[in-house]
Amino acid sequence: MHEMSIALSIVDAVDAQARVEGAGRISRVELVIGRLAGIEPESLRFCFPAAATGTLAEGAELDIEEIAAVAVCGACGFRFSVTFPVAECPECRSLRISVVSGEEFVIRSITIEEGD
């Protein structure tokens, strides 16, 4: 389960930023994860509390927005949902497709509370 290492990296990043801001604690972390990013949101939710133990993010709420995978056909311009990184256009069967969303993995925001 690589989600634990991802959770640890997220906690490291948000903890460092919160310390720069002089925070006393982090109350919320918001992520954007595309369906093709190779990350299981439920596993990440499970790992996050353990990864956050002993940091400013301990007890923080983890909010994850999942982004659908969408591709555009380079031959006919048709936009369509994809479930795998490789797909063909359902309209013209071309393999000239470009994924335009669904690969995101972003820390959108953190909510911090001021330190003492």
UniProtKB/Swiss-Prot annotation:
Ni(2+) binds at H2. It comes from the Bacteria. The keyword Repeat does not apply. One of its GO terms (molecular function) is zinc ion binding. Keywords: Metal-binding, Nickel, Zinc. Zn(2+) binds at C73, C76, C89, C92. GO terms for biological process: protein maturation; protein modification process. The keyword Zinc applies. Involved in the maturation of [NiFe] hydrogenases. Required for nickel insertion into the metal center of the hydrogenase. Belongs to the HypA/HybF family. This is Hydrogenase maturation factor HypA. It comes from Chlorobium limicola (strain DSM 245 / NBRC 103803 / 6330).
